Structures are given as structure tokens and as C-alpha cells.
């Protein structure tokens, strides 16, 4: 069995197109189920399922409040860990930027590497130059503070035995990609990040800053140690602590502390309002 998890907030038009693409690229031998996480959408769910002949089941988890995609994924994984004993999971976004044609390759890799999470790294991004530059800065800053090169997002596939590993320390409530890096073995594959089916990308500078802080926050102890190392290095090289650098390090750590203090605020609350079948 293969369960495809898709968080969605209002973008039902894109989701319908994505489901059609998934159906067209699914093998008839595979038992495919869709788990949609309705992240407290303002728009009423509208699904066109008439031509989805290869998808065996579509289940919608209606959340009781808006959580954002990362926490919506955490809710989905907590739900799935009690469903079946052995199956494969794919997590992807609903906007069309994750290539549904790449799913079969990822599942094949997951079957060969049951103890690993297959993550799809981006070959290229369909954004403007400024966002591409900001994304590179995000990758470099994240690496400098964590010594982890996290160049992938939600798009991933794995055997269900990895669910408990991903959920083991609650860091998934902060950033799914970091939780995967921290708690599991990963195998990388590469695919081009496509254009959104409809509308404009929500990625902007503020989004990337917030995203970076959440990713870094998962590795806070490592960030603290590296921050001290960089301070000592600057002191040794320049025989003094640079005040600007000191303030920057302090602000980064303060923001991270505030961010991680909120990461578990929802984990013990029943966040699934209703379960529907399409």
C-alpha cells in the first residue's frame, strides 16, 4: 500500500489537478490512497474524483485550526502511525511544484532502502532571481549554524517503519525536513521544482527567514556550540569581539529559543476535527 500525504490550505483547484496527475502516473498494480490534510481552509473542499480510477481511496482530515504545512504533516504522521503496520508514504505539496512523475522513482528507492527516507532535492527553482539568491543565502546560513546541508523540502518517500523515527523527538512540529535529517537516514534523489499550477508562489524573503529559523531551531544545541566557536574564532583572529557579530549571534539564538519554545504547543491537543471520505 502507498499513502500520499498532501497538506492543503484553500488551493483545491491545484489539488484537483495534482490528483489527476498522480492518477495518470500511478501503476495499476499499486494500491494508492490519498490522505489530504485540510489545514482549516476558508474555502469549502471541492474535489473532482470522477476520473481517478487508479486511486483506491481519498481521505480528508479536517484540522480544527490552521497549523501551517509543517504541523499539518506532523498531524498526518501521528495519524498514520496507528493505521497500518507496513506501507509506503509519500509527502508532497499540493501546488504542483513537486513533480508527480517522480513519485514512482522515489517509491522504488524507498522499497530498496526501507530504513531510509528518500528526499527529493531540487535541481532548479522556478522563481525570480532575488528569491533564488535568498534561497542560496538560506542554505549557506543554515549550513554555517548547523553543519547540515538541507536542500530539500517536504517531497519525500519512505517505508512506514520510519514514521516513529521522524516523530521521536517532536522536532517535526517545527520543521519536517530537519526532523528527517536529525532522526533518520536519508537517501537523496533529484528532480526539478516545477511551476505552480495556478497563482503565484508564496515564497518571499520573510517566508525564507522564518523557514530558516525553524530549520535551524531543530538543531539548537549544535547552533549554540557553533555560535560559541565562531565567537572564539573571531576573537582569536581579530583580538577582540566584534560588537556587530556578537549582537547578530545573540539575536539569532534569542529568536531560535522563542521559536522552539512554541514547537510543542499543539502536539498534545486533538487537532483533527473530522475525517471525511471523498
Residue ranges of predicted features:
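Cell-envelope/extracellular polymer assembly enzymes that use nucleotide-activated donors
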Residues: 1-3, 33
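Short, well-formed alpha-helical segments that are part of the catalytic scaffolds
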Residues: 11-26, 44
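Catalytic donor/gating beta->alpha subdomain of glycosyltransferases that bind UDP-sugars
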Residues: 164-223
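Membrane-embedded multi-pass helical conduit in multi-pass membrane proteins
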Residues: 222-278
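Short beta-strand/loop segment that forms part of the nucleotide-sugar
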Residues: 30-41, 61-62
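A conserved acidic beta->alpha catalytic loop
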Residues: 38-47, 96-97
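Acceptor/aglycone-binding surface of glycosyltransferases and processive sugar-polymer synthases
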Residues: 64-65, 70-79, 91, 97-174, ...
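Short acidic donor-binding loop at the edge of a beta-strand
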Residues: 83-88
